[in-house]
Structures are given as structure tokens and as C-alpha cells.
């Protein structure tokens, strides 16, 4: 997933945080799963395309896809992010 998003220029960077254990309810049952958290660095204007790519390629019926706004960031980093996600 990470490689796909970066190669399609939908993300400038994707960090994988592994060895997570998620506890949740699914279809009336308590579940525990090992998961990998992806932190996807992209522009908000690409959200719908990123979401579509994740939904198409993810094994979960309802994967967690949330968007957190960047309230502040270094100008050089944000410029790099914009450049790497430009078409």
C-alpha cells in the first residue's frame, strides 16, 4: 500500500508503524488483531484519491481511514510534500 501511494504520487511519504495490537468490536464480537498503522503524508486535495486507493487495495471491509489537518509545519517540508505529490 505504501509503495503504491508513493509511486502514484498520492503521498510524498508513508510511514509504517508495525507491531500494533488493536482491540475493537466487529459484527457483535470483540476482536484483537495485529495491524500496521500507515501515516500517509499528502495534500488534503488528494484525500479522495488516497481513500479510493486504500479501499480498493485493503483486505478489511472497513479499514480505518482518517484525515488529520496540518495546522503548522516547516515551510521547506511542506514545499517538499507539495512537490512530491504534484502531477
Q: What is the meaning of each model-derived region?
A:
Residues 1-87:
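Positively charged, small/polar-rich N-terminal and surface patches that mediate targeting and assembly
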Amino acid at each position: 500500500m505504501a509503495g503504491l501511494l508513493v509511486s502514484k504520487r498520492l503521498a510524498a511519504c508513508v510511514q509504517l508503524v508495525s507491531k500494533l495490537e488493536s482491540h475493537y468490536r466487529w459484527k457483535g464480537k470483540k476482536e484483537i488483531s495485529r495491524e500496521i498503522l500507515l501515516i500517509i503524508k499528502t495534500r488534503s486535495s488528494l484525500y479522495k484519491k488516497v481513500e479510493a486507493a486504500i479501499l480498493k487495495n485493503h483486505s478489511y471491509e472497513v479499514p480505518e481511514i482518517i484525515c488529520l489537518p496540518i495546522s503548522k509545519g516547516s515551510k521547506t517540508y511542506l514545499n517538499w510534500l507539495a512537490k512530491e505529490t504534484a502531477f
